[in-house]
Regions:
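Structural core segment of the AMP-binding/adenylate-forming
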Residues: 1-35, 49
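Conserved AMP-binding A3 loop
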Residues: 60-86
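Conserved AMP-binding/adenylate-forming
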Residues: 204, 208-304
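Conserved S/T- and glycine-rich ATP-binding loop of Class I adenylate-forming
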Residues: 59, 65-68, 101, 106, ...
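Active-site charged/polar residues at nucleotide-handling catalytic sites that mediate phosphoryl
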Residues: 5, 142-143, 223
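Short hydrophobic/charged patches on amphipathic alpha-helices used for structural packing
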Residues: 48-51, 137, 217
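Conserved pre-ATP/AMP-binding loop-to-beta segment of ANL
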Residues: 12, 27, 34-64, 71, ...
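Conserved AMP-binding/adenylation subdomain of ANL enzymes
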Residues: 83-100, 107-213
Length: 304
C-alpha cells in the first residue's frame, strides 16, 4: 500500500480465512515454492551463485522487538552477528550434532531462530517440530529434547499442570512427593552442581530420583535435557530452584534482539537464581552513568 511502496508480495503459510482475498500480491507458501522450482529449472546456477555472493556482514534477517518499552522496532542482523553468537554458546555448552531440539516458539522471535535454527547451522543437531500447537507437551515427551529453551511463563505452566495432577493423587503418593521435594530443595541443586553432599542424603536423593524426580522429569518431557535455558522475563527463585532441584540443568541468560540473544550466560558450576551469569566470550559490558547496560562485541545490530 501507500505506507510500504516497495512491498511487492505477501506470502501466507496458512490459507484459512483468505478464500475471498483476490489481491495479486498475496501468495500462498505452496505457490511460492512452485515459483521457486520453476525458476530453478530455468536458471540452474542461480541459487548456488546467490549463496556464494553472500558476505558475512550482509543483512541476514530482520526481527521485531517486543515493544514493551516503546514502539516495536525492526532489528536487522547480519550473518556474522547470528553465526558468531550461535558458535560462541554452542562451544561453551559443547553442543553437538547428537542434540535434539523442539522448535515450538513463534518463528518470528529472535530466540526461536537462534536456539532452533542458527545453532543448527553451527552444530548440525536435529530440530523437531510439534505436530500442532495443541500437541506440544505430548510431542515434547515423545521427542525428549536434550537442548531446550523456555520462557518462565512456559515453565510455570508445565509445573502447574503437574502439580494439579499431583493434588489428585492418593494420600501416600502425595506424602511421598512432598517429602522427596523437601529433600530436593535442600540438596538437589548441590548434587546437580557437583558439590559435596553427605552419603545419607545422596542415597535418599537417589531413591527419590527413582520414585519421584525421574518420573517427574519424564512427565515434563525433560528426561533427556542436558542444557536448558530460560530468559525473556525474570523467573521466580522458587520456580528456578524447583527445576534444578529435580536434576534439570536449567540456567539463566541475558540478551536482546539487538545482541543476537547471547550477552550473559550462566556456565555450569556458576548457576544462581539471582544472576544471569558472566558475559559470553567476545562480549564486553559496562554500566553507564545513567544505569544503562552498555554492550560491546563484534556484530551487534546492523540497523533498525
Amino acid at each position: 500500500g501507500e505506507q510500504s511502496p516497495a512491498l511487492k508480495h505477501v506470502v501466507c503459510d496458512d490459507p484459512r480465512g483468505l478464500r475471498h482475498y483476490t489481491d495479486a500480491m498475496l501468495l500462498s507458501y505452496d505457490r511460492l515454492e512452485e515459483i521457486g522450482r520453476d525458476y530453478a529449472a530455468q536458471h540452474p546456477d542461480f541459487f548456488a551463485r546467490a549463496v556464494a555472493a553472500v558476505q558475512p556482514h550482509d543483512a541476514a534477517a530482520m526481527f521485531y522487538t517486543s515493544g514493551t518499552t516503546g514502539k516495536p522496532k525492526g532489528v536487522v542482523l547480519t550473518h556474522h552477528a547470528l553465526i558468531d553468537r550461535a558458535r560462541a554458546v554452542s562451544e561453551m555448552e559443547n553442543l553437538t550434532d547428537r542434540e535434539d531440539v523442539l522448535a515450538y516458539l513463534p518463528p518470528a522471535w529472535i530466540g526461536q531462530n537462534m536456539f532452533s535454527y542458527t545453532q543448527l547451522l553451527v552444530t548440525g543437531f536435529t530440530v523437531n517440530h510439534p505436530e500442532s500447537p495443541d500437541t506440544v507437551s505430548i510431542d515434547m515427551r515423545d521427542i525428549g529434547p536434550t537442548y531446550y529453551f523456555a520462557p518462565p511463563r512456559v515453565l510455570e505452566g508445565l509445573l502447574t499442570h503437574v502439580m494439579i495432577r499431583m493434588e489428585d493423587a492418593g494420600y501416600l503418593k502425595r506424602k511421598l512427593f512432598h517429602a522427596c521435594m523437601k529433600l530436593a530443595r535442600r540438596v538437589g541443586t548441590r548434587i546437580l552442581d557437583g558439590e559435596s553432599v553427605n552419603a545419607w542424603d545422596r542415597l535418599r536423593y537417589a531413591l527419590g530420583n527413582v520414585l519421584i524426580y525421574g518420573p517427574l522429569r519424564n512427565a515434563l518431557g525433560m528426561s533427556r535435557v542436558r542444557v536448558a535455558y530460560t530468559a525473556g522475563e525474570a523467573i521466580g527463585p522458587d520456580l528456578f530452584v524447583f527445576y534444578r532441584s529435580i536434576g534439570i540443568n536449567l540456567k539463566q541468560l541475558y540478551g536482546s534482539t539487538e545482541t543476537s540473544v547471547f550477552v550473559c550466560v550462566q556456565p555450569d558450576g556458576q548457576v544462581r537464581d539471582d544472576t544471569v551469569g558472566p558475559p559470553v566470550a567476545g562480549v564486553e559490558i559496562r554500566v553507564g552513568d545513567n544505569g544503562e547496560s552498555l554492550v560491546k562485541r563484534p556484530g551487534l545490530v546492523k540497523e533498525y
